[in-house]
C-alpha cells in the first residue's frame, strides 16, 4: 500500500526522533524536542545552488531596474511628461517586489530564537505590505498631478525626450525579457522532459493505475520540491513583470511619438498617465489579496483541506480527525494543527510519526502539531 510507504519512509526523521535523549513522558507521546520545523525545511528541501542563482538573478534585475528608473525620473522631469514618471513608478513597484523576493530568500537562512519561535518568515509579508503602500502613495501623487494638468492644460511636453526615454526603457525591458525568458523556457523544457519520462514509465506499469489514483489523494505534490518551485516562481514572476514593463514602455513610446509629431496633443501624455497608473495600482491587488489571506490565517489557496483530512483519516490507527487547522506564516511556510481520536490499541507515537511524514511528503507541511486524544 502507498500509505504504508508514506508512514515508513522517513530517512531524516529517524535520526531526528532519536537524537537528543528525551524524557520518558516525551518518549511515550512520541514527541521529541526539535529545532524549528521551518529551519529543517530549508535544510532538507532547498538547494544552495538554486538559492544562489535566484539571488544573483534578482540582484542583477534590481540593479538594472534602478538604472532604468533613474533615467526615466530624470527624463520625465526634463520632458515634463507624467507618462514617463508613471512608467518609473511602475518600475518602483517591480523593484519593491524583487526586493521582497530577495528578502524572502535571505530571511530563509535566519534561525528562529526563543522570542521569535516561528523565525522571521513574516518579515516578507510586512515588507510586501510596505511596498504596496509606497506604490499607492507614488501613484496617488502622479494621478493628482495628472488631474491638475487636465484641469489647467497649461503644461507643455517635450515629445522628443519622452519618446527617447521610453524607447530606452523599452530596449532595457526587452533585454531583461530575453535574459529571463531563456531561463524560463529552459525550466519548462526540463519539466516537459520529466513529464515525457513519466508517461513512458506509466505505459510499462499499467497495472499500477489504481494505486497511482489512490496516491493522488495521499501524495498530491507528487515529489515536487517546494523550495525549488518557490525559487522558480520568483524568477517567473520577474519575467512577467518585465513583459508588462516592456508593453507599458511601448505604450509611452507611442504616446511620445504622437506628441513629438503633434506637440499640441499634450492630452495623450495625461491619458497614458491615468491608464498606466491604474495598471500599476491593479498590479498590487493580488499582492494585497495574498497579504490579507496570510494575516487572516486562511487555508492556502492551492490546498484542499477536505482532501487533506481524508488523507489523514487513511493513516493507520487514525479513527477521527477534528479541530484541523491549516494556515501560512508566509507564502509557502504552512502550519498544521489537529486532534486525532485513535483506533483502539493504536500507538500514539506511530500515529504522530505517520501524520508528520504524510504532511511533509504529501503537502510540504513541515510544522505539524498533532494531539492524540484518548476515548
From Swiss-Prot:
Biological process according to GO: zinc ion transport
Residues in compartment: Vacuolar: 79-84, 144-160, 262-264
Keywords: Ion transport, Membrane, Metal-binding, Transmembrane, Transmembrane helix, Transport, Vacuole, Zinc, Zinc transport
Membrane topology (UniProt): Multi-pass membrane protein
Pfam families: Cation_efflux
NCBIfam families hit by this protein: CDF
Family: Belongs to the cation diffusion facilitator (CDF) transporter (TC 2.A.4) family. SLC30A subfamily.
Name of the featured protein: Metal tolerance protein B
Organism field: Arabidopsis thaliana (Mouse-ear cress)
The organism's taxonomic lineage, starting at the top: Eukaryota, Viridiplantae, Streptophyta, Embryophyta, Tracheophyta
